[in-house]
Curated annotation (Swiss-Prot):
The gene is clpX. Belongs to the ClpX chaperone family. One of its GO terms (cellular component) is HslUV protease complex. This is ATP-dependent Clp protease ATP-binding subunit ClpX. ATP binds at P117, T118, G119, S120, G121, K122, T123, L124. The keyword Chaperone applies. NCBIfam families: clpX (TIGR00382), PRK05342.1 (NF003745). Coiled coil: none annotated. GO terms for molecular function: ATP binding; ATP hydrolysis activity; ATP-dependent protein folding chaperone; protein dimerization activity; unfolded protein binding; zinc ion binding. It comes from the Bacteria. Residues 1-53 form the ClpX-type ZB domain. GO terms for biological process: cell division; proteolysis involved in protein catabolic process. ATP-dependent specificity component of the Clp protease. It directs the protease to specific substrates. Can perform chaperone functions in the absence of ClpP. Component of the ClpX-ClpP complex. Forms a hexameric ring that, in the presence of ATP, binds to fourteen ClpP subunits assembled into a disk-like structure with a central cavity, resembling the structure of eukaryotic proteasomes.
Length: 425
C-alpha cells in the first residue's frame, strides 16, 4: 500500500512567510524560523538591553554620593571607598558610552582587586555597591572552584548565580556585579610554572581569565557540569563588573623583603619595617608582589584596579557595633524590642567585645558570633518573661557574671532607657 504525502511548502512558524519569500528558513523540532524573525528577535533583545542599561546609568550617583552612602554602612576604609566609588562610576559610564555607539576611543573594562585582612569589610563594600546601584549581585568562593573537567564547581556556575539574582533577565545580568572571595587561595603553589596540573590554583585562574575579560559564555541553566545534550543560556560577560577579594596572608613579608632588598649591608635587613603595621606595609604593594605570591600575570592584568583595606582597630570595631545603619547592636536591640524587652550594652562591654574580636583576629566578622554567644541565654528567657531589661557589662563579656535582667514593669514611668550609652568621640 502506497501512502500519499502532501508536499506542502515550508513556512515560518512565527510570521507564516513561505520559504521562497525569505532568505533563510531554519528548522527546529517541529518548527521553523526565518531570518527576518531572527533579526526582529535580535533587535528586541538589543532594545531590552538598552532599556536595562538606561535604567542603571540614568540613576548612577556621583562618586562623592556613592562614597557618602558607603559611609552609612562601612566604617573606615576611606581610601578604599574613594577608589571603589570612582571605579564603579566609571564602569557604568563606560557602558553608557559603549551602548551609545561611539567608537572613537575604546574604553576597557576595569575589574577590581580588594586586599585586606579577614573582617575588614571587603564583602560588605561589594554588597553595598550593588545595593546602591540596584544591579544583580552574586558572591562566589574561589576555594570551591576547579578547572573544567575536575571534581568541584565550574566557573560558569558563578554566572548562573548571577542569572538567578537577575531572575533570568539576561540583559540585566549582563550589567551585574560578581564578587569572588578568597581569591588569594587560588594562587599557584610556586612562583615558577609547574609541569603538574594545578586544578584548584593556576587552573582556576586560567578558567576565570576569559569571563573576567569578556566573552559569550554558555551557562547551563540547571547548574552542574556541562554535557552536550543540555541547553545553554548565552551570557555576554563583557560588561559584568568583577570584584575579587582576599586576605593574602604572608604578602606583607614579600613586600618587606622587596623593600629591604635595596638596602646595603647586613644591618640594613634587621627589621627596618619593625614599627610598621600590616596596613602600612600593604600600601607599598606592587604587581611583582602579587606575582611572587602566586597570581599569574594574565590574571593580575584582568584586575587593573587594586586597593588595600586597613586592619580594624578597637575604636573602629566599637563604631561598627553601634553606628552604621545596619549596626550589629542595633539589630539585636530590635530583636529584643520584638519581645517587649530592652537591651542595654554599656561602654565597658563594647570595649571588651572589640578586644575579644581583635584577640581572635576575626575583625568585624567575629563581632556577631561574640554577641550571639553573650545573648543566647537572655534571648531564650525574654521570649517567655516579656517586659525585661537586659544589661550587658564588661564583667558579663569576660564571663565573670551572668547578664543582668530587671523588670520594666517595676519602673513607674515605664519609659525606655537609652539603649546605647554615648560613646566618647
Amino acid at each position: 500500500m502506497v501512502v500519499e504525502t502532501d508536499k506542502k511548502e515550508l513556512i515560518c512558524s512565527f510570521c507564516s512567510k513561505k520559504q521562497h519569500e525569505v532568505k533563510k528558513l531554519i528548522a527546529g523540532p517541529a518548527v521553523f524560523i526565518c531570518d527576518e524573525c531572527i533579526d526582529l528577535c535580535t533587535d528586541i533583545m538589543k532594545e531590552e538591553s538598552k532599556v536595562a542599561l538606561k535604567q542603571i546609568t540614568s540613576s548612577i550617583p556621583t562618586p562623592q554620593k556613592i562614597c557618602g552612602i558607603l559611609n552609612d554602612y562601612v566604617v573606615g576604609q576611606d581610601q578604599a571607598k574613594k577608589i571603589l566609588a570612582v571605579a564603579v562610576y566609571n564602569h557604568y559610564k563606560r557602558l553608557e558610552y559603549v551602548q551609545s555607539g561611539n567608537n572613537d576611543v575604546e574604553l576597557n573594562k576595569s575589574n577590581i582587586l580588594l586586599i585586606g585582612p579577614t573582617g575588614s569589610g571587603k564583602t560588605l563594600l561589594a554588597q553595598t555597591l550593588a545595593k546602591i546601584l540596584d544591579v544583580p549581585f552574586t558572591m562566589a568562593d574561589a576555594t570551591s572552584l576547579t578547572e573544567a573537567g575536575y571534581v568541584g564547581e565550574d566557573v560558569e556556575n558563578i554566572l548562573l548565580r548571577l542569572l538567578i539574582a537577575a531572575e533570568f533577565n539576561i540583559a540585566k545580568a549582563q550589567k551585574g556585579i560578581i564578587y569572588i572571595d578568597e581569591v588569594d587561595k587560588i594562587a599557584r603553589k610556586s612562583e615558577n610554572p609547574s609541569i603538574t596540573r594545578d586544578v584548584s590554583g593556576e587552573g582556576v585562574q586560567q578558567a576565570l581569565l576569559k569571563i573576567m575579560e569578556g566573552t559569550v559564555a554558555s551557562v547551563p541553566p540547571q547548574g552542574g557540569r556541562k554535557h552536550p545534550q543540555q541547553d545553554f543560556v548565552q551570557l555576554d560577560t563583557s560588561n559584568i563588573l568583577f570584584i575579587c577579594g582576599g586576605a593574602f596572608m604572608g604578602i606583607d613579608s614579600i613586600i618587606t623583603s622587596r623593600t629591604n632588598h635595596s638596602s646595603i649591608g647586613f644591618a640594613a635587613n634587621v627589621n627596618i619595617d619593625k614599627e610598621k603595621n600590616n596596613s602600612e606595609i600593604l600600601k607599598s604593594l606592587e604587581i611583582e608582589d602579587l606575582t611572587k605570591f602566586g597570581l599569574i600575570p594574565e590574571f593580575i592584568g584582568r584586575l587593573p584596579i587594586v586597593t588595600t583595606l586597613d586592619e580594624l582597630d578597637n575604636e573602629a570595631l566599637i563604631t561598627i557595633l553601634t553606628k552604621p545603619k545596619n549596626a550589629i547592636v542595633k539589630q539585636y536591640q530590635k530583636q529584643f524590642e520584638l519581645d517587649d524587652a530592652e537591651l542595654v550594652i554599656d561602654d565597658s562591654a563594647l570595649e571588651a567585645i572589640a578586644e575579644k574580636a581583635l584577640a581572635k583576629k576575626t575583625g568585624a566578622r567575629g563581632l556577631r558570633s561574640i554577641l550571639e554567644h553573650l545573648l543566647l541565654d537572655s534571648m531564650y528567657k525574654v521570649a517567655e518573661l516579656k517586659k525585661q531589661r537586659v544589661i550587658i557589662t564588661q564583667e558579663v563579656v569576660n564571663g565573670l557574671v551572668e547578664p543582668i535582667m530587671t523588670s520594666l514593669i517595676s519602673t513607674k514611668s515605664n519609659k525606655k532607657q537609652p539603649i546605647i550609652e554615648d560613646i566618647p568621640a
